[in-house]
Amino acid sequence: MYSKFWPKGGLPGILHHYTETLVTFEYTTTTTRKPHSLLFVGGLGDGLATTSYLADLAHALQPTEWSLFTLTLTSSYQSWGLGHLDRDTNEIAQCLKYIKEYKTEKFGGSASSGKIVLMGHSTGSQCVLHYLSRPNPHTHTPAFDPYLEHVERMPLDGAIMQAPVSDREAIQWVLAEGLGDRTPAEIRPVFEKLTSMAREAARDADAGTDVLLPLAMTSLVYPAHTPLSARRFLSLTSPESPESPSEDDLFSSDLSDEQLGKTFGMIREQGLLRGKLMVLFSGADQSVPAWVDKDTLLSRWRNATDHNGEAAIWDENSGIIPNASHALSNDDQAEPRNFLVNKVLGYLSALVKA
């Protein structure tokens, strides 16, 4: 459905190739010097500029020294069911390297003079946390992606996560409440069959193959016409959680403090974040089950990130956006969108002054 917030007439900018086949679009004008960069990564199903509040951010950043970038990944649009976080963050690292070199060449000065911030929405937040918390470069080459080339990830001046929701708890919410006109009684048997099929197929994945699940079944649970591999299905649904969470299960509310220490708690050790991590949770996120206590969850993430006060990585302006939906795309989201934009502008302004 077309959002009333999409800008009519388009927005100006520059299309860049950061690899031969992947691009990033820079919202910018020629009238303002813009040495600083904010790279935005969307969630599952997103692509170039598909998150509607980007238009609000682009307008708000026009008079500042910041330019906003959006990008395509191999996993963009309907390819998320074949992707994985190592490949996503390798490509994000390539894009950031391109942006840093482009800005340094354009505006001069040292390579450290222009600030770089990475912002993720939804599953894009998983990319942000994966980028910051995993070994640098990544160390594992999966059998299903044998030509994956790991690259060294550059340190970031700042990082923002918006709507960091659990894909596992989102599907549990669907199983409890239904989806659209489908009841839980209709969805649950299909989901259980998919889980059984995926587990069986996962054994083949270890041998180097990645098996697609039937579209006729996955379309009852996930968006239609989207290829979904058994491997990614299990990573998103993480049936062994909370004891043994999958790669994609980073934000579930039932993960132990020990598990959070392996993700949020590793940001300090990896040393890839020079500044602060700001986390913005949507107060009325339709992907978050009613049983999740958002304030408690944010507090636990903060404690893990800051090692119970030993570090100061968590940004004080993190918090819940009142009445915000998941992507702030509904027609009643003007006030939450303004709240979000002001939070981001304040964060970026403080970063430059620091």
UniProtKB/Swiss-Prot annotation:
The organism's place on the tree of life at top rank: Eukaryota
SUPFAM superfamilies: alpha/beta-Hydrolases
Phenotype when the gene is knocked out: Leads to decreased growth and increased intracellular accumulation of hydrolysis products of the siderophore fusarinine C.
EC id: 3.1.-.-
Protein name: Fusarinine C esterase sidJ
Function: Displays specific fusarinine C (FsC) esterase activity but does not hydrolyze triacetylfusarinine C (TAFC), which has the same core structure as fusarinine C. Both extra- and intracellular siderophores have been shown to be crucial for the virulence. Subsequent to chelation of iron and uptake, FsC and TAFC are hydrolyzed and the iron is transferred to the metabolism or to the intracellular siderophore ferricrocin (FC) for transport and storage of iron.
InterPro entries xref list: AB_hydrolase_fold, SidJ
A Pfam family recorded for this sequence: DUF1749
Assembly behavior: Homodimer.
Encoding gene (name): sidJ
GO molecular function (one): hydrolase activity
Sorted UniProt keywords: Hydrolase
Annotated organism of origin: Aspergillus fumigatus (strain ATCC MYA-4609 / CBS 101355 / FGSC A1100 / Af293) (Neosartorya fumigata)
Recorded family membership: Belongs to the sidJ hydrolase family.
Catalytic activity of the protein: fusarinine C + 3 H2O = 3 fusarinine + Fe(3+)
